[in-house]
Amino acid sequence: MNRGIARVLPLAAILVLAACSGGSINPSLNPQNSSANEQSAVAPPDALTGPASREAPFVGANPVRRLCPTSVDPQLMECLAMVRTDVAPTLSAGADLADPAKTCIFTNAYCPVDLQSAYALPSLSKGAGRLVAIVDAWGYHHAASDLAYYRKAMGLKACGTGTKCLRIVNQNGNPSPLPRESGPSDDWKGEQSLDLDMVSAICPNCKILLVQTDNNYTSSLYAGVKTAGRLGAKYVGASWGGPESGGDNSIFHQRGVVIVAAAGDNGGGGHYGGPQEPCSYTYVVCAGGTRLVPAHNARGWSESVWNDLTFDRCGFGGSSPCGATGSGCSRKIVKPSWQHDTLCHMRSESDVSATASLRNPVAVYNSEEPGGGCPTSCWFGFGGTSASTQIISGVYALAGNAATQAGAQNIWRNHTGHMSDVTVGNNIDPGVGVTCASTIHYICYARIGFDGPTGWGSPKGLGAF
């Protein structure tokens, strides 16, 4: 399978190969060839269609793979990234001549320039010297080299361990020994590649601290979050979650530290019958997911609730490889004083959202991802609320206001004029066994203003952060 830019061949050579093969992996990659069922997806009414949609329609059975299976052990956390297995990022014509910092090199996967445009971010002028931490389980031996390749291909400044821009430590904060890599059933290497690339895409001037924990037990990952704060990170992304098990945890209430966590990829019912921790904690910013598409409007982009459950290729219920953003009304966490939606009397999830759909994925480079045919083709389309989590963490780092934050209160107080409201879509589909765990309509359905799947919407600049 051709997966875009080769690691060892020049870009121009890959373009020649793409041209010889018709420019795509499969004719069905063209949005105009997608099935009528797929075309019926809920999308903003102003969304562009055809090739301009930047869409990568699902092709064949099981088009998506969850990187981490849902565990029956409540002490294990699930990573919340997903990857396309049927199609891959396809190079745009003339990609070898374009400036990747100004024009995306892929036709069907998003680059940093797309995300910066969609969310009106001053990514090239802000963030210098700020430290963003990514806390993930297990090892990833090629983290530094894969990140270096991604950043070079995307026109971003270099960020490596030699320049102290990138620092990789274990859960105790030491550079060695680093954990071993996870087994084949838990692809935390893919999770880490997505996280590193998304932080880089949003805040290329930021420094990055990658904390690799011994395993994906709750105790290990929580220890990693504590270590991230101790080592000076003011912005921490947690792209994983599990069932609510109790009240707040003090590790996630670190003064002057913004912690963002993923709302989940299992829709409004979730695998756990509601919201998940740590996203539902009082002092955590809970990030939901959207489907971001080019649009006929002044912004140039539009968003709906991320819901890939509505397609017949995705299977049924908890076995579905496809996903939708999580949401919920907590059963464990008391409502924060700054949350003022009226029907959920406990903590409402989510607070904010960003792109997560696998139909319009983000481009990620990973030389260790299964099925990529590396070393000659290592680009993949990724999604899930892991992506939105690290995007939002990067936005907070650009804003640089960690000292004034307490959970998501600034978003709830300052959203007017500084967020793009998402008013289309929902995160359920009874036809595939996913129903809303709450009787409160807005917990699973988008509306004007706050709703569970997308919170107050997606960033419109930095004013709410």
Model-derived segments and spans:
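Short, surface-exposed polybasic-and-hydrophobic patches located at secondary-structure transitions
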Residues: A298-G318
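Substrate-binding/charge-relay-adjacent region of secreted/lumenal peptidase catalytic domains
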Residues: P27-G289, R313, G317-G383, T389, ...
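Short acidic, Gly/Pro-enriched loop/turn segments at secondary-structure junctions
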Residues: T218, V293-W301
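C-terminal motif of bacterial Sec signal peptides marking the signal peptidase cleavage site
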Residues: V16-A19
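Aromatic sugar-binding interfaces of carbohydrate-active proteins
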Residues: S388, T404-I443
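Bacterial signal peptide processing site
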Residues: S21-S24
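Bacterial N-terminal signal peptides that target proteins for export
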Residues: M1-L9
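Walker A/P-loop NTP-binding active-site region of P-loop NTPases
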Residues: V395
